[in-house]
Amino acid sequence: MLKAFKAAILALLVGVAMLVTGVSAAQAEAPPSSDPDASLLQRQATSPEQLQEQVDLQLRLYPGGKQINDHEVAYDDGKFVITFAQPGRQLLASPDCPSGWFCFYDYANYGYPRGKLSDCGWQDLSAYGWHDRTSSVHNRTSTSVDYDNHTVGGHENDQYMFSNYSGGALNLSSTQTNKADHVYRYC
């Protein structure tokens, strides 16, 4: 009885903390997927059918998003958007982040899939399945963006990795690649 009471109190406190901080259940930290098909999200589709499989898998593994066209999924009313490479699309070699957004790419040289955000403040990329998936970045906002690595335990152990300044585009070093878990945009 006491155990159940403690669990109920803890759940209530977590719910209140999420309401106070504005963090939705979809934004609560999600563990990396153990689904064997998850690698499909990180490679280029070879057909329109496989592209739809990627979109469907993204939505199954990381619920709360909405397909907005044949190759994009949006979360939190469009605050975070994942763009999958369309079949036949070549590696970019130059960044293509839209104005007003900051983007992070799964591959070096701005290779898709691409995630993009425009909100200010702290964002947890794991809520969208984008933790440990950044190899290049492009910032088209008017402010800088910090990237952090969540190592172990609570967020007090997060490690600052680098800043991406307004207008900046860069390929990450081998010590930074596929480690970003959180971003902070200064506004």
Each language-model region and where it sits:
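Compact beta-sheet-dominated domain cores in extracellular/mature segments
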Residues: E29-C187
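Secretory targeting and sorting signals
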Residues: M1-A30
